[in-house]
Each structure stands twice: as C-alpha cells, then as structure tokens.
Amino acid sequence: MLLNISSSPISHRNPHFLSNFNNPISYFPRRSKTHLSKSHFFPKFTPLSNQSLKNRVLFGNKRYPDGERFDFRSRAISGIDLGSFESVLEAIAVLTTIIVVHESGHFLAASLQGIHVSKFAIGFGPILAKFDYNNVEYSLRAFPLGGFVGFPDNDPDSEIPIDDENLLKNRPTLDRSIVVSAGIIANVIFAYAIIFVQVLSVGLPVQEAFPGVLVPEVKTFSAASRDGLLSGDVILAVDGTELSKTGPDAVSKIVDIVKRNPKSNVVFRIERGGEDFDIRVTPDKNFDGTGKIGVQLSPNVRITKVRPRNIPETFRFVGREFMGLSSNVLDGLKQTFFNFSQTASKVAGPVAIIAVGAEVARSNIDGLYQFAALLNINLAVINLLPLPALDGGTLALILLEAVRGGKKLPVEVEQGIMSSGIMLVIFLGLFLIVKDTLSLDFIKEML
C-alpha cells in the first residue's frame, strides 16, 4: 500500500517546532500499494503550495455555525519527534489496522467467491510469528511496509491442480477484478465509518481564530527559555510585524523571521496574563546556519464541537467531511505529479508516518479519527493508479486481457512487470526507513 498524505491541513493543536528548521513546515501525503494483494506504506510530505511555509488551517474553506472547520493536525518537520511510547503505540495501531482492513478486503472477496487463498501476512520479509488455520498461513513479518494476501496459483508446492477453477488465475475477469479492487473498497468504507463514528461520538471540531500565535511549549535550555518566553504565551508581533489570526500564515511569519536571524535579536510582542510587553530573544544557530529558538507554535484558536441534531444531519456532516478529505487527497496527488521536483524530497516512510501519527495521538481523539480516515482515503486513491504492483496496475492488466478478447499476457511478462514494481517499492521502503530513522530527534542528538 502506498499512502499520499499531501493535503492534510494542520489544526490548532498541531505544534510547529522552532528548533530544527531544515525543512519548511508542510503537509504530508501518504500512499498505499498492492500487487493483487501486496501492500506497502510510503508517505510523501508535500507542501500545499509553492510557498512551502504557507500552511492553511482549513479544508475547502468550509464554514460551520461556530466558526471555521478545522481538520487534523498533520505536519512534517525535519527533526522527527516520536514523543511518548503510548502515542507511538497508538499510531502503530492505526497503521496496522489500515493494513489489516485493506488486506481483509482482498481476503474476503476471494474467500466469499470460493477462490483459494494460501497466505495472509502483515509486513514483509522474515516471519516473526505465524499460525495456520483452514489451510491459510497467517503471519506477522519483519518489515512494516504493508502486507499481502497470497494465492497458490504459481506455488510449486501446492497440491491444487493447475486447472482448478477456483485458482484466482482461472477465474473470469469480473471475479478477479472484484478481488483486486476489494482492498480499495474496504478502505473507502472504513474511512466513511471512522468519520461516522467521530460525528456521533465526539462531533466535528470547529475553530474560531484570534490574533497572534500560541506557544504551547518551550524547550528547556533553549534560546526561548533563556530569554524569557514561557509556555502559554501568545506572540502578537515579531520585530514590529503584527500577526493576524490566519493561523498557519502567522506561524510561518515567525518561522521565517527566526530562521533569518541566527545570533541576532528578535523582538517578540507577548501577551501574558492580560498584559502586553516586549521580549528580546536571540536565536541559536542551527547546524544548517538558520536560527532556532526551541519552542512549539500553534495558531491561536478556540475550539468548539458541532454535533448533528438528527440522523439526516449526521449523514450530511459525514458526507461533507468525507468529500472534503477526498478532495484534499486528490489535490495533493495532483500536486505530487505536477510538482514532482519540489515534492520528491518530501517522501517519507513508515517511521515518519508513525512519528506524525504519534504527534496526532498526543493531541486529542479528533485528530486521531481524521488521521485514520485520511490514510484510508489516501490508500484507496493511490491504489487506483495504473502502476506496477498497485491494485490499479493489476486492474489495468485485467482490463487489457478483456480488451484482447480474454487472451492473457505471457506469464513471464506479467510477472516481470509486477516483480520489478514490488522490488522497487521494497528498496525504496528500506531506504526511507533508514532516512527517517536518522531524522529522529534522539538519533540526531547522538550523531
């Protein structure tokens, strides 16, 4: 599975770390991939505009009764912070659930049609744990790049005759198309169900923006701590530039000014305890020559919840939210293709996904709902692309077979196409795991 989370806006709680500004703040895409049944996770952290520091709070500029609709806190920064062990486990649980849902779609579509299935795996590579049930091997594997459902079609050790009508390769194109597309359908349904549960249980959070930028946290021994900034302060202006209530735009102004002024005084206009006053902060010099002060920043907003008053309104809320997330995913995918030179460096692997998910989990349940829903939608959209080793690539081969009057491509050709795609994804995934691991804050401090 390949996920593309490029279009996720940040929320009021999504903190931006002003300590390692190697990367601009950006949105993260995520992609999902399946060869018939093989899934791989590789996200891309892609900015929503050419001005990479320009973040936006809202999806689709929607207006709700109590303010502007906000969506979950997605962010990408150069220094990845995994946070607490509990939040990491929550993020891993979300990713694992998404993999299981996707592969279960393939598995159930095959089983319900009487098609032989031999394996159901989470992860790739060496087997860590396994058990057999009803002639199917269920396994947990070493590399967390996705999962797969295996079929005995080309297994030389299989005792099933090669002409058995219940082998996947011997079924009509419609049956095979259902199996291949079932993972996509499962993720779409799951995303809708997640949003439905969110609306009924906690409602949809909305926000009203206020001038300035909130400082949720000040790191110990940082420039900000040394020069007097405190957690809970609201920054109203920087070097005489007043900060509006446009959320991430105001955050970006602070980021720009701090980055440009290492070892130089920056004057912050602060609101604290009902009083306004100035504080001079001297940013430390980062390893890349930019300034850093060691704080988290977030838009200064007030959050309320909107709950549906009846069943029809529930479905309207859910449908609007689902369409908004889907639109964002499609926009992010379009930007990935049309601005590839700018977005290629934002590709990230499972470690970065878990880091972002952990940050979401540390915030509140609203963000975790939207994190899971968005990843499912990304998974479905990306898998529709007609590329080797993706569900869409397999569907394209089935369509080509139908156009050719049921004449299949030579087995060697089809296997070569899929195998090359899978190997590329595996090597890319391993590379990204190493890259993202080296970006972890505690690893960078050790190096």
UniProtKB/Swiss-Prot annotation:
Spell out the molecular function terms from Gene Ontology.
Answer: metal ion binding; metalloendopeptidase activity
| The keyword Transit peptide is annotated on this UniProt entry | yes
- Entry's Gene Ontology BP terms: chloroplast organization; proteolysis
Bilayer-spanning residue ranges: 177-197, 379-399, 413-433
Q: What is its EC number?
A: 3.4.24.-
Q: What happens when the gene is disrupted?
A: Lethal when homozygous.
- Transit peptide (first-last residue): 1-73
Question: Where is the protein found, in the record's own terms?
Answer: Plastid, Chloroplast inner membrane
- In which broad location class does this protein mainly occur, judging by the first location in its UniProt entry? plastid
Instruction: List the active-site residues.
Output: 103
Uppermost EC category: hydrolase
Q: In which tissues is it expressed?
A: Expressed in green seedlings and cotyledons. Low levels of expression in roots, siliques and seeds.
- Please give an example of a GO cellular component term from this record: chloroplast inner membrane
Q: Which cofactor does it need?
A: Zn(2+)
Question: Which Pfam families does UniProt cross-reference here?
Answer: PDZ_2, Peptidase_M50
InterPro entries assigned = PDZ, PDZ_sf, Pept_M50_Zn, Peptidase_M50
Listed binding positions for Zn(2+) are 102, 106
Keyword line: Chloroplast, Hydrolase, Membrane, Metal-binding, Metalloprotease, Plastid, Plastid inner membrane, Protease, Transit peptide, Transmembrane, Transmembrane helix, Zinc
Homology family? Belongs to the peptidase M50A family.
Q: What does this protein do?
A: Metalloprotease essential for chloroplast and plant development. May be involved in regulated intramembrane proteolysis (RIP).
Task: Name the chain's protein.
Answer: Membrane metalloprotease ARASP, chloroplastic
The protein's organism comes out as Arabidopsis thaliana (Mouse-ear cress)
Q: Which gene encodes it?
A: ARASP
